[in-house]
Amino acid sequence: MTPGQRRRCFGLLRSAGDVWACVLEVNAWRRRHHAPPLTGYQELCRELSASGPGTFAELDTTGARSVLRRFSDAWFAAAKRRKAGDASAGFPRRRRGLVPVRWYHGTFTLDGHRVRIPTAKGTPGLWVRLARQVPYPVEQVRSITLLCEGGRLFLDVTAEVPITVYPAGEGPDPARVAGVDVGIIHPYAVAGPGGEALLVSGRAIRAEHRMHLADTKARQHAVARRAPKPGQRGSRRWRQYRARTRVVEGRHRRRVRQAQHEAARTVVGWAVGQRVGVLHVGDPRGVLDLPAGRRHNLRLRQWQIGRLLQILTDKATLAGITVHLVNERGTSSTCPTCHRRIPKPRGRTLTCLHCQFSGHRDLVAAASIATRTPGGGPTTPTSPVVLPGVVTHRRVGRHLPGAGRSRRDPRRPPGRREGPVGPRWPAPPTSGESLAHTARIHNTPPDSW
């Protein structure tokens, strides 16, 4: 991308931010005059048409309307959350410098590694070369979105992909239901209807979070003395540090996101192999409202529950599998055999003090989740819980730096030494004599010294 193309792309994003700011100013004026705000998409478009052409530089009408659609969706989403009782949900009232712009099918042109981004009437066309070719046919692409993340420009492509078609007798069976328990150490623990189970380990993701926090702390401590004071302009070295910080943050997000996609793909592939047609996923978002201390709140913030659920739902829907969110309350502290409450285990093994049942905590929870009813219902299992017998272990995040086996891991095979590893120091004499000093033994006569 040439500097001119980059400048024009950022100009489109800034113009979209101007559209967002104009909507905020109009609603602020209406609020001061005790008038209802403009929130509907149609009335916002009518207000936009009154501004006239050329108001927002090179941003065309389609791109400006996509910003209005984004504002309207954000407003109604906040209203829905407030109506449901979430007092922390806030309406969009803050200005944004760069706002993503979306263009729909028929307004842009895809030609191999190039794409023509539509601009305002009377301005030259903006052709941008892509880093790689779009992996979908042109007729399946429905929209493109220009956005900026970490100081880098991206083009998000939305395509209409058909649902997978299976041969007769090999597709997902709606009568086969599996339970999925979402966690931190194990992103997904799945219990199948026939006693099969899948355990996806995400310890590499946790290690990536810890390494990123340690690296961030070290970098901030190193440059804290050179940081500009409030009201001062940063030096060139400070700008370089900020650029490096954005690069590291973006790399960390991409690593974690790739590992999350690997975990969801592993679950969906396993479910397709087991012909599972319905996934009952435990909804753990209720724990976010519980105060759990500084350290555990950090783990919950790094968990990214919503993204894990969204990725799994998207991939399962594409494979023809239905996903239902169910209440997971008490699944990790209820015995699946005698249905009695037991102390929540601190480790990974759940043991019942009443019937002496023992099993993996996450897999037992997944087996109990499979019996729950979507949309509510009793938490006590109404049907027998199918306990997992054959467990398949999978790891995600092998591309992460901390994914290697620990040196203290007892499963680490002992190293084999093929001959000497190097020259000894000091080298032994050729005569075979020892280089150690002669020992002085006190019970020997002095003549023998």
Predicted regions and their residues:
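A short acidic-Thr-Gly-centered motif at the start of a beta-strand
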Residues: L153-R176, L350
